[in-house]
């Protein structure tokens, strides 16, 4: 359990200290945000703000993960605190999606092209990373036969519907692409996506700890053995989630309004990808839609807006994604962000409540 605390604290410290150094570096190179002309007028003042800030919390998360394990092993050599395949796989997904986002950001900055990577190239990059994760997640079973992912669909735990490896890859790709682009759409206001991510990664830290304590490997000592969890490396998933929570919290210090740096696609694609990876490996795939409810809500606002305009020629919202609709209604940016954080907090509370209820009622 110590490594979970170490990971969160180290991640927090690294982004608090490291982000301003990244801000200076990006500003010196002129890597500032390109603002679209069709957005809210208030956003024009953000033009030139350093972007690609996701580099800070991606590096901090990876460093916090390994440092936490090294410190834990040093303090207590009897504890097996080495990296696990599940933890490395989820971190690899984060880094891979972050690289796709980095290329997108780089093209926006260097080419001064607001849309960044061509849609086809961006999709190919995301698919490549997602397929690699999905295929590898069904390999390398532990001594109980558990692989990082399962071909059964899951809500709070796996349920009986097995979809097979091919459909699983398709399902995993859908989750990764949907959530990575959902976080990307959410990242339109200072601190919005970062703060929401802190909350959801906090939830996955709790889930990982709970699944470790209630693991089927310890069935003889459990108070409710009928509700145990067959999850590979749940404690290590909690370490990853804690490192992410701490790193995002430290980054939020610099990303909150008025933002000194933006995460860019580098950060948003990485956060969405790693969130989907945590859900897949913790067997909470459908629960992710509730825990990450704000990302789903904002994504659906875009789907509704585009669908309505194509079918009827009319728009449902003044502007999509949803946060900009409220800006155009006269809400201040800070008001929108705080209220959306509250919505995300409610989603996390409901999701964790369902998670606990599933354990308590499954005898």
Swiss-Prot record:
It is found in: Cell membrane. Its cofactor is Mg(2+). GO terms for cellular component: plasma membrane. Pathway: Cell wall biogenesis; peptidoglycan biosynthesis. It is a multi-pass membrane protein. CDD domains: GT_MraY. Its EC number is 2.7.8.13. Keywords: Cell cycle, Cell division, Cell membrane, Cell shape, Cell wall biogenesis/degradation, Magnesium, Membrane, Metal-binding, Peptidoglycan synthesis, Transferase, Transmembrane, Transmembrane helix. It is an enzyme of class 2 (transferase). Catalyzes the initial step of the lipid cycle reactions in the biosynthesis of the cell wall peptidoglycan: transfers peptidoglycan precursor phospho-MurNAc-pentapeptide from UDP-MurNAc-pentapeptide onto the lipid carrier undecaprenyl phosphate, yielding undecaprenyl-pyrophosphoryl-MurNAc-pentapeptide, known as lipid I. Belongs to the glycosyltransferase 4 family. MraY subfamily. HAMAP family: MraY. This is Phospho-N-acetylmuramoyl-pentapeptide-transferase. The lineage of its organism: Bacteria, Bacillati, Actinomycetota, Actinomycetes, Kitasatosporales.
């Amino acid at each position: 359990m110590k490594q979970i605390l170490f990971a969160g604290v180290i991640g927090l410290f690294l982004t608090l200290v490291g982000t301003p150094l990244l801000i200076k570096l990006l500003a010196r190179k002129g890597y500032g945000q390109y603002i679209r002309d069709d957005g809210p007028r208030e956003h024009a003042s953000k033009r030139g703000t350093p972007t690609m800030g996701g580099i800070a919390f991606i590096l901090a998360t990876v460093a916090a993960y390994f440092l936490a394990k090294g410190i834990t092993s040093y303090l207590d050599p009897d504890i097996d605190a080495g990296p696990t395949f599940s933890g490395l796989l989820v971190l690899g997904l984060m880094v891979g999606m972050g690289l796709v986002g980095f290329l997108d950001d780089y093209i926006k900055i260097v080419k001064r092209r607001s849309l960044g990577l061509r849609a086809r190239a961006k999709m190919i990059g995301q698919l490549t990373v997602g397929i690699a994760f999905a295929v590898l997640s069904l390999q390398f079973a532990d001594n109980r036969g558990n692989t990082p992912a399962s071909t059964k669909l899951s809500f709070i735990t796996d349920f009986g519907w097995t979809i097979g490896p091919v459909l699983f890859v398709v399902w995993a790709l859908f989750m990764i692409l949907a959530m990575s682009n959902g976080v990307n759409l959410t990242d339109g206001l200072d601190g919005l996506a970062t703060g929401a991510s802190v909350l959801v990664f906090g939830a996955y830290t709790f889930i990982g700890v709970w699944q470790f304590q209630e693991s089927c490997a310890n069935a003889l000592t459990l108070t409710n053995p009928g509700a145990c969890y067959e999850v590979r490396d749940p404690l290590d998933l909690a370490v990853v989630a804690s490192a992410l929570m701490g790193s995002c919290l430290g980054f939020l210090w610099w990303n909150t309004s008025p933002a000194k740096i933006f995460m860019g696609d580098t950060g948003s694609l990485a956060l969405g990808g790693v969130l989907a990876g945590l859900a897949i490996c913790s067997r909470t795939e459908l629960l992710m839609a509730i825990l990450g409810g704000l990302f789903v809500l904002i994504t659906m606002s875009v789907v509704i807006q585009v669908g309505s305009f194509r079918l009827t020629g009319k728009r449902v919202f003044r502007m999509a994604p949803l946060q900009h609709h409220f800006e155009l209604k006269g809400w201040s940016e800070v008001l929108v962000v705080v209220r959306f954080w509250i919505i995300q907090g409610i989603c996390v509370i409901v999701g964790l409540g369902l998670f606990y209820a599933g354990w308590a009622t499954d005898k």
